[in-house]
């Protein structure tokens, strides 16, 4: 079930370095929210705070709150691993497990999180591959290595792996940046389908992509070099690209910087 994310007063650190500062926003369920902004503005860091992946980096910590349908993801006693089951992630470069078959790649998270009969696993793997629009391309070679697929197919395999555990939210960190235009189109079409089931947040440097796939867009920027990233503006995507409220947003979208 897709869930709403409410962020309030979020500041993230890596050791003594303040990466982002005082971010507050809401991500609506069953929608696509795009994060845009120049390199180094903190959009990927912020994305990672939404499922506590930033804590994998030594010294990663936050102040503020992230609520998933009123559940505090940073509350006392909350297991980060359980958070990542609810809030899945797809990374910039396709990263199928290289020694695993296509089937085992999709089933990996399921096996980690519980005990399933083979028939149950087969049913979920098929459903997930169909959900990622990959089933018809791989159904006759499920025992072959996932690393043998094309780049676009590998990324869809990673999406199938992420949705197999039925998360509430799906985070995507530049999921098309390493793909060719045809594969990018396939992923964008898939995002449009997945938002019917999941809350989706995507980081992208491609503003045309943000305009195509998202319902809402958030623009991040730095006040100055060496300063933490900040959320400058968030609104309906159509408004952000046609009539932004902040001059810096218009300057970035029009190509004056970034």
UniProtKB/Swiss-Prot annotation:
Enzyme Commission number(s) of this protein: 7.3.2.1
Binding site for ATP: 37-44
Top-level taxon in the UniProt lineage: Bacteria
Catalytic activity reported: phosphate(out) + ATP + H2O = ADP + 2 phosphate(in) + H(+)
Membrane topology qualifier: Peripheral membrane protein
Subcellular location: Cell membrane
Keywords, sorted A to Z: ATP-binding, Cell membrane, Membrane, Nucleotide-binding, Phosphate transport, Translocase, Transport
Annotated ranges, domain ABC transporter: 5-247
Any one GO biological process: phosphate ion transmembrane transport
Cross-referenced PROSITE patterns: ABC_TRANSPORTER_1, ABC_TRANSPORTER_2, PSTB
Keyword Iron found: no
Gene Ontology MF terms: ATP binding; ATP hydrolysis activity; ATPase-coupled phosphate ion transmembrane transporter activity
Signal peptide: none
InterPro entries: AAA+_ATPase, ABC_transporter-like_ATP-bd, ABC_transporter-like_CS, P-loop_NTPase, PstB-like
Pfam families documented for this protein: ABC_tran
GO CC annotations, alphabetized: plasma membrane
Enzyme class: translocase
Task of the protein: Part of the ABC transporter complex PstSACB involved in phosphate import. Responsible for energy coupling to the transport system.
Family: Belongs to the ABC transporter superfamily. Phosphate importer (TC 3.A.1.7) family.
The name this protein goes by in its record: Phosphate import ATP-binding protein PstB
